[in-house]
């Protein structure tokens, strides 16, 4: 697309960053002075009843800056990148039609990528094929299916852990339905985002600072009732660790503690480690991302002014 035709597109802002980097706080401040509406880009914040462990904005923050695509699903429900793209595009169109600018804020990079670049034409899920895969897994174990995936799609197998049944079964399902590998199909991009996007990423200048923030926040969450929140989910009886909601960082570790698999101290240690690993993956994604304006989360006023400088011009 030419620069001229790009300039005629409606405007949108991405505010990305690793967990515990201050994205939400910055977005809320920006909402006070810019004609923007916030859309959450977070695969954990979509779930109802998962507030403490996801660092969901509180009632006061949401009153000041309402977030769309927040609390839209029960934790028993699944939600794909395709679902997000569909919902985000609908919200963006509504915001743009009202004469305002969509500000998409979050840390789920796969959602941002799906929105920006479009999705490859993957086949829809087939319950019959999925049932056969699950039956085979019950008989032979998921490690045997992982070896099967290694034979047909070694690239996908290298990315998918043998203990990740959801992604493993999907990769095999795609191959059985289409005769093409997940790797082949994902190399075919879909429809690009019909917006002129200004992209920002916020993170601390040093990894040590981010690690400190993560550890402090995890302890704050525990002090704010994180364990009680997970116990309430556990008590429902219809949720389990194969579900994306319960695999969210922190939730999975507390779940293991509740089941008696690990001690409290081990749960805290694993929860902090898992959150740090998530942040590392998020930063790796962002470093390979083109067209990003980086912001230092340790300098909130400077970050705020930098965004205003760029966005102020497009918001006039």
From Swiss-Prot:
Presence of the UniProt keyword rRNA processing in the record: no
What cofactor is needed?
Answer: Mg(2+)
At what residues does the UniProt record annotate the site feature described as Interaction with substrate tRNA?
108, 130
Single GO BP term: tRNA modification
Q: Which InterPro entries match?
A: Dimethylallyltransferase, IPT, P-loop_NTPase
- EC supergroup of this enzyme: transferase
Tell me the superkingdom of the source. Answer: Bacteria
Q: Which GO molecular function terms does the record list?
A: ATP binding; tRNA dimethylallyltransferase activity
| Keyword Transferase applies | yes
Q: Print the keywords alphabetically.
A: ATP-binding, Magnesium, Nucleotide-binding, Transferase, tRNA processing
Signal peptide segment = none
* Annotated EC: 2.5.1.75
Entries under HAMAP family matching the protein? IPP_trans
Subunit comment: Monomer.
Record function comment: Catalyzes the transfer of a dimethylallyl group onto the adenine at position 37 in tRNAs that read codons beginning with uridine, leading to the formation of N6-(dimethylallyl)adenosine (i(6)A).
- Give the family, as the similarity comment puts it: Belongs to the IPP transferase family.
What's the protein here called? tRNA dimethylallyltransferase
Which gene produces this protein?
Answer: miaA
